[in-house]
Amino acid sequence: MKRIHVKGNTWVLEGPQLVGLYQIDESTCLLLDPGSTKLQGEIEAALAQAGLTPVGVLCTHMHYDHHESTRYFRETYGAQTCLPQLEADIVRSEESLKNHLFNFTMGMIRTIPRLQNLVCPVDRVIAFGETELVFCGVPLQVVRTPGHAPDHVCFITPDNVCFAGDVLMTEDVLAGAMVPFVFDMADDLKSKEIVAGLSCD
């Protein structure tokens, strides 16, 4: 993955998916939406090239293409994890994940790697109504943007850069989807208006 500078200490790792990166100091960083397990090697290579170790992972929501690698970075690097309340509730256990993914059996939850990887301890839960967060020493703004997922959030870094998760989708993503997944269409449309009204860089 290619590390691209956005502004200040805010970067993005560009590859098959975009992974947010906030550099805390010369050797540590936060990852935002580290994506699927297919990206782990590429992320690690980009971090090694930059001399960075992830100490925290934040996710806008718990879908596999944003959250699946979270447990890996927690177990491998000791990175702290952070998700919004409802998303954290879903990934706390195999049972809670099964409750959310009702069309999968418990046997599938326990044996399909993509599903098993979603189950992960959450060190810092973003409570309802919480709009500011200090995570691994980094002050972040939290913008509630439900719709695509039940408790989707956006993160604004100290550089005033917004990581919008799946509130916004690229033309490539839209072209490849007959109908983009939305948990609640009315909420999703309201959230798009919220993001459009942000004064971020």
Q: What is the role of each PLM region?
A:
Residues 1-50, 154-165:
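Conserved beta-strand hairpin/beta-sheet module of binuclear metal-dependent hydrolase folds
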Residues 2, 11, 53, 80, ...:
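Conserved beta-strand segments of alpha/beta enzyme cores
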Residues 9, 17-18, 122, 128-131, ...:
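Residue-level marker for the onset of beta-strands and adjacent loop->beta junctions
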Residues 9, 22, 33, 61, ...:
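Divalent metal-coordination and catalytic microenvironments
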Residues 22-27, 108-109, 168-174:
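Short, basic/glycine-rich phosphate-binding loops at helix/coil junctions
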Residues 36-37, 139-201:
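Metallo-beta-lactamase
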Residues 38, 45-131:
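Active-site HxH/HxHxD metal-binding segment of metal-dependent hydrolases
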Residues 49-52, 133-138, 198-199:
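Glycine-rich phosphate-binding loop signature in dinucleotide/nucleotide-binding domains
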